[in-house]
C-alpha cells in the first residue's frame, strides 16, 4: 500500500474530535515555527497557505459529537489566520497585519484564477483527473463571493478591535484582547458568509432560522473553543520572535 494511503487510512481510525485537536495543535505550532524562521514574512506565507487550503478543506463535512448536522472542515485553518493577524498586530503593528489580509486575499484569488484556467484546458483522452479537479476547484460563484467578502470584513475588524482593546487596556491583558477580538471576528465571519451564501446570493434562500442554527452557530462552538486554545500560543509567540524583530 502507498504510504500516503496507509497514513490517511490510519488517521481515519481516530476519533473525529481527537483528530481535529491534532490538526489544531499542528497548525498553531506551525504558526510559531514560521514566525521563528521567517519573522513577519513567515506569517504572510502561512496565512496565504491557510486561506487557500482552508477554502479547499471546507468542501469536506464530518460528524462532531456536539452537532446533529454535519460540520464543514476549514475552521482550524481559517482560525489560524486570526492568530497570525493578532501576532502581527501585537509584535509588528497593525499596518503589517493589514498587509497580511491583502496577501491572503490575493493568494486565494490568484489560485482560483489559475485553477479555472487549468480546468479550461481540454483534457487528453487518457486524462483521469479533470472531473475531480473541476469538482474541487470550480467554486459556486455565490460561495466564492461570500467567502472573500466575509474574509476581508472579519479580518479588518479583527485588526481594528484588537488595537482598540489594546489601547483601552493600556497594553495589559493580552488574553483579553486575543480572545475577545477572535471571538467577535469569528462570529462576524460566520454571520457575513452565511447570510450572503445561503440567503442574499442564494436563488433558493434558506430560512433565517436554519441559517442561524446550522451555518452560523454550527461551527461557532468550535471557533470559540479555538479562541481559548490559541491564547497560550499568543503568549509563546514572544519566545519565537526572530532576533531582528522588525
Regions found by a protein language model. Name each.
Residues 1-88, 92-95, 102-105, 109:
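Hydrophobic transmembrane alpha-helices
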Residues 132-138, 167-172, 204-209:
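Helix-boundary and loop/linker segments of multi-pass membrane transporters
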Residues 140-154, 218-230:
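Hydrophobic alpha-helical transmembrane segments
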Residues 8-19, 32, 170-177, 183-201, ...:
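Alpha-helical transmembrane segments and their cytosolic interface
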Residues 117-142:
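Membrane-interface interhelical connector segments
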Residues 107-125, 151, 155:
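Transmembrane alpha-helix/helix-exit interface in multi-pass inner-membrane proteins
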